[in-house]
Amino acid sequence: MERAHPAPAEPGASAQILPGIALLGTSQGLVASMARIVMKFGGTSVADIARIRNVARHVKREVDSGHEVAVVVSAMAGKTNELVGWVQEASKAEGSNLNIYDAREYDAVVASGEQVTSGLLALVLQSMGVDARSWQGWQIPVRTDNSHGAARITDIDGSELVRRFGMGQVAVVAGFQGVGPDNRIATLGRGGSDTSAVALAAAVKADRCDIYTDVDGVYTTDPRVEPKARRLAKISFEEMLEMASLGAKVLQVRSVELAMVHKVRTFVRSSFVEPDAPGMGDFDNPPGTLICDEDEIVEQQVVTGIAYAKDE
């Protein structure tokens, strides 16, 4: 599928995605290519160097297919919890069990997990002959409000990433973070890398956003609890938002909201399927679940899925 790039935006122009959120990515200077894809890999997918190498193989598959690629990564599994523990230990007042800390320093420490992963993945990709570099949130920049620890993205300037796409370079982006009005690192809260990926996909006008996890799609209910749970081929943004709000752990609620507002076609896929497995290179119908506009779903089911919370 050949991709027709839109005309360059007027200088200073930006597209509003939500009140107060501007997307500044343009397609200036690009030649036609097959597609532009944002790929996101969670903590279990990048838990160690062996798994990071597997992630790199997934990325290389898309690059070898002629696609422009940005990759958003989480911290390695367990690393964020470890960093939070360090913050709590370091901030204990002498002779007290109270943890009183500066939220800006908390963010500076906790955001480092994603920074490590992005650098490691860029190195592995380079070792495979792929032109890649790592990007921190402040370098792009991904701008946020000032709510340190639970910040919201206000705008993303994707113009430099788009320029690098035109040069054939893969952008490996540290998820979960941006830069606040105070020019300090601000983290987006738990699950924030999903939001980073969808917002980036909207900013650079990606054709698709692939969320790679340890499951191979969205199921009618938790397959670990109900063996007869069925994987859905497609689910609407509205249905996914409702399931996420009710406790489904596949995607963070905020990421689904952004995908729905900006019509970002989002696939939930497994990073543990071999990159060269049958169908993995199928652009239109890869294995997994497509989260899309309701108009793309021909037949609506009365009940799409069941979500529940274990502690209720």
Predicted regions located by residue number:
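Conserved glycine-bearing catalytic or ligand-binding loops at nucleotide- and phosphate-handling centers
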Residues: A248-R254, L258-P287
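Charged/polar low-complexity intrinsically disordered segments
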Residues: Q16-G20, Q28
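A broadly conserved detector of short glycine/acidic/proline-rich loop/turn motifs that flank catalytic sites
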Residues: F176-Q177, V215, S270-F272, D295
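Broad gene-expression machinery/nucleic-acid interaction feature
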Residues: R36, K263, E312
